[in-house]
Amino acid sequence: SFPQGLGTGSLFVTNFSGAPLCLEGEHMWCGTPDQREFNREAAHFRHTFLNAEPSLSVQTSGSTGQPQRLSVEKQRMVRSAEATLRFLRIPNGSTALLCLPLKFIAGQMMVVRSLVGSLSLRAVCPSSRPLATLHDAPFFAAMTPMQVFESLRSPHDRRLLRRIRRLLIGGGSISPTLEEELRDFPNE
C-alpha cells in the first residue's frame, strides 16, 4: 500500500488514517485485501440472488438452534425484506451497513433488503468493531450483540452507533448490561 503525497513528490505516511491505496498489477484500489474480498462476496451474492433460479441455499448461524442449510425461495426473502423495511420505516435510498458474514442468512438478508429498498449498501468486513472505519453513521444496520457491545467501548464507534436511526440486533441474546447501556439510545 502507498500513502499519497498530493503530487508534491513526497510520500506522507502518517497524514491519512483511512484505508490504504493498494496496487495489484495495473490496478489501484482502496482498502485492505480482506475488505476487497468481502466486497467481491457481496457482489457475488447480489449476482446469485438476481439470477433466474427461484430458490437459494442458505446457511443459518445456529444462534437459535443447530446451524442448518436450507433451501429458501427468493420471493420469500423479498417478502421478508419488504416487511422489515415497512415495519422499520426505512425510506428508499437510505444508507445501510452490511457488517455480517455473507455465508449466513443474516448477512444475505441485508443485501436483499438493500436491493428491495434501493438502499445504498456499505459493506464493511465483519469484525467486532464494524463502525471503526466509518466516518458517517448509516441510517440502517444489523449487528450482533457482541458488535454492539464492542462498539460501545470506543468513543468514535459509540458516537456513530447513537446516530444509526434503525438498528437490528440479533444472532445472540442481549445481556442485561447491554440492554441497560442501550436504554437511552435514540435508535429504533
Residue ranges and their predicted role:
Residues S1-E37, D136:
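Structural core segment of the AMP-binding/adenylate-forming
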Residues F2-F16, T84-L85, F104-G117:
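Hydrophobic alpha-helical segments in the ANL/AMP-binding
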Residues E41-V58, N92-G93:
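Conserved pre-ATP/AMP-binding loop-to-beta segment of ANL
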Residues P54-E82, R89:
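Conserved AMP-binding A3 loop
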Residues S55, G93, H135-P138, L161-I164:
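A general structural motif
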Residues E73-R79, T95-E150:
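AMP-binding/adenylate-forming
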Residues R86-P91, D157-L160:
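Glycine-rich helix-loop-beta junction characteristic of Rossmann-like nucleotide cofactor-binding loops
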Residues P155-E188:
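Gly/Ser/Thr-rich phosphate-binding loop
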